[in-house]
Amino acid sequence: MSRRTRLAVAALALSAILVVGLLVAFASLACPSDAPEQPCPGAVTNRIVVIGLAALAVGLLVVPFALLSEFVIRGRILYRGAWGRAIRRGLLAGASVALLGGLRIGGALTVPVAIFVVLLAGAIEWLAIRRFDAP
């Protein structure tokens, strides 16, 4: 693994930690005086921002770990397309988090729907491996 790749992996992991810190700060400061007699005026917007930040954090955190796992599995060699596969997996993980959060806000999240979303992400990755990563 080259120095540039190690630096990119570290930068992605640190940016994910930064986004998580931003998420925690926003969630703790968004509506500090939410009470039954005085509800938060921007509660829906705050929830959407929190879900977006969570999806971004998950996506940024999955990419370096997907790349590192491929590096270990393939015998400590990064083949062509490794970054593309890692980015695709990060996008799928972030989209799954965003979709589950959106379903939760809409009140449509149930256990079967959540299982379907996770299985759908797995099926998309399986089809992408067969279609794009075939030798």
Residue spans of the language-model regions?
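Alpha-helical transmembrane segments and their helix-start/interface "positive-inside/aromatic belt" motifs
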Residues: M1-S15, R47-I48
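Membrane-helix interface motif
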Residues: V19-P36
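Short juxtamembrane and helix-loop transition motifs at transmembrane-helix boundaries
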Residues: N46-V49, E70-W83
